[in-house]
A protein has these predicted regions:
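A conserved acidic beta->alpha catalytic loop
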Residues: 41-50, 69-71, 93
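Short loop->beta transition adjacent to catalytic acidic/histidine clusters or analogous donor-positioning motifs
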Residues: 4-7, 28-39, 47, 59-63
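Acidic helix N-cap motif at the loop->helix transition within catalytic regions
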Residues: 19-21, 46-55, 97, 101
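Glycine-rich, basic loop-to-helix element that forms the pyrophosphate-binding segment
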Residues: 67-84, 105
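Short aromatic/hydrophobic "clamp" motif used to bind/position activated sugar donors
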Residues: 89
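N-proximal low-complexity "stem/linker" segments adjacent to membrane-targeting elements
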Residues: 1-28
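Conserved donor NDP-sugar-binding/catalytic core segment of glycosyltransferases
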Residues: 101-132
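Conserved nucleotide-sugar donor-binding catalytic segment
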Residues: 82, 135-215, 223
Length: 252
C-alpha cells in the first residue's frame, strides 16, 4: 500500500494558553495519521510556550520553534511554512479546532480533482467550546472572480500543496494577508475545491483579532485597489459583496 503523503500542520502561537491544548488535540485525533505539527511561538507572555513544549515532549511529531522577537502572525506562519517537510501544508490557528476527518477528506479532494487548494465549511465556537451562530457553508468550487464577491477560503480550513505555498508566502504588509494570498494564487491559476460539510471551528474570543472588525473595511478596499489592481467599478462591486457577506457571517 502506498504511504500517505506527509502533511505539515503550521500553527502560530501567541498567548493562547487556554486553547493551545485543544487545538493540538484536534490535530492528534485526525484520522489521517502521517502528520507533523510545527508550533511557532511568537514571544507569548503567558504559559503558551510552556504548554507547547510539554506537548512536544509527549509526541515526537510536534516541533516547537520560538521567535526571538515578536514578528506578527504573517511572518510567524511564514517561518513555519519554510520549515515544513510535508507534501501538503495545513494551517491552524492556536485557538481553533478541527473535526477528526478534516485532513483525510481534504487530501482526497485534492487528489481526486487534481487541485492545489482545499477548503471547507466551518462553525463558530466561544471560549467555552459552545457553538455560536450558524456555520458558514462554502460552495464546492471557487475561483478568482467568485472570491471577489464571497471569500470562502480561510487559514484554519485550508490545505495547500506545499511547493505552491512555499513559493507564495503571506505578505505581512496587509491586514487581510490570507485573503491577499488566496487571491494571488487563484489569479495565477491555482485550482481550489471545497467540502461543504463543517470540518473546522473558529473560536471567537472577546478582543481577539478575529472578533475585532475595526478598520477591516478600509484594509479590504486597499487590497482591491492597490494589490489586485481592480477598476473602481469592480472594486465597488467586490466591496459591497464583502460587506454583505461579513454582516451575514458574523451577526446571523
Amino acid at each position: 500500500m502506498e504511504k500517505m503523503p506527509l502533511i505539515s500542520v503550521v500553527m502560530p502561537l501567541y498567548n493562547a494558553e487556554k486553547f493551545i491544548e485543544k487545538a493540538v488535540e484536534s490535530v492528534m485525533k485526525q484520522s489521517y495519521r502521517n502528520l507533523e505539527i510545527i508550533i511557532i511561538d511568537d514571544c507569548s507572555t503567558d504559559d503558551s510556550l510552556k504548554i507547547a513544549l510539554a506537548l512536544a515532549e509527549k509526541n515526537e511529531n510536534i516541533i516547537v520553534l520560538t521567535n526571538e522577537n515578536n514578528m506578527g502572525v504573517s511572518k510567524t506562519r511564514n517561518r513555519g511554512i519554510k520549515e515544513a517537510q510535508g507534501e501538503y501544508i495545513a494551517l491552524l490557528d492556536s485557538d481553533d479546532v478541527w473535526k477528526e476527518d478534516k485532513l483525510e477528506k481534504q487530501v482526497s479532494l485534492l487528489l481526486n480533482h487534481e487541485a492545489q487548494i482545499a477548503y471547507c465549511s466551518y462553525g463558530f465556537i466561544n471560549e467555552n467550546d459552545r457553538p455560536i451562530k450558524k456555520p458558514f457553508i462554502v460552495p464546492e468550487r471557487t475561483n478568482f472572480n467568485k472570491m471577489l464577491a464571497k471569500s470562502v477560503i480561510s487559514c484554519s480550513t485550508a490545505l495547500i500543496k506545499a511547493d505552491l505555498l512555499k513559493e507564495n508566502l503571506f505578505d505581512p504588509n496587509y491586514y487581510h494577508e490570507d485573503y491577499v494570498l488566496w487571491m494571488q494564487l487563484l489569479k495565477n491559476g491555482a485550482k481550489a475545491v471545497g467540502d461543504n460539510s463543517v470540518l473546522a471551528y473558529y473560536r471567537q474570543v472577546t478582543g481577539s483579532r478575529s472578533s475585532n472588525k475595526k478598520n477591516a473595511a478600509l484594509h479590504r478596499w486597499k487590497i482591491y485597489r492597490e494589490v489586485l489592481n481592480l477598476s473602481l467599478f469592480k472594486s465597488v462591486y467586490a466591496f459591497v459583496s464583502y460587506a454583505v457577506c461579513a454582516v451575514i457571517k458574523y451577526y446571523f
